[in-house]
Amino acid sequence: MKRRILLVDDDVAVLLTLKAVLEMHDFDVHTATSVSDAKTKLDTGSYHMVITDMRMETETAGWQVVQAARAQKYRPATAILTAYPPPDSNWQDRGAQSLLVKPIGTRDLVRQIEALLVNHEDEKQSQSLDRSLQATRADFPEKNNRKVS
């Protein structure tokens, strides 16, 4: 199954180039050129990952895309793609799981995307197992309170 990526950038040349590169590496790539376009696609589709430029309509437009992605029930992996990395490391605190700095070579880009997708899926599975375990414990409260001698 191809992994679906939403790629968001207001520079159409960058968008089309990255789309072609990622499709050559067997990703199903959808594109958006603005925050509002990205939000619409996030609400109507389902993506494994969202990669967004940080600076589009505003200097913080990318963060709006990340927040919209993180609000989705399907919880896609999120990455900021920028030529202007933030001076501090608060990009993770703001919801992005990866920071991709332009220019970036094709090999490095694909490697970082693959690694992020693997880590993200592992985290989602771990969280799902934790929820299942908590639900099981809630179903059997008397066993949880038993003392072991």
Feature locations, PLM:
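CheY-like receiver
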Residues: 119-149
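The short loop immediately C-terminal to the conserved phospho-acceptor aspartate in CheY-like receiver
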Residues: 11, 55-57
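Short amphipathic alpha-helix used as the core "switch/output" element in two-component signaling
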Residues: 40, 60-75
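Alpha4 helix (beta4-alpha4-beta5 surface) of REC/receiver domains from two-component response regulators
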Residues: 64, 71, 83-101, 107, ...
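C-terminal output helix
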Residues: 104-115, 121, 125
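Hydrophobic/aromatic residues positioned on beta-strands within the core alpha/beta folds
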Residues: 79-81
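Acidic, metal-coordinating helix/loop segments flanking the phosphotransfer/catalytic sites
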Residues: 30-49, 57
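Two-component/phosphorelay signaling modules centered on CheY-like receiver
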Residues: 12-30
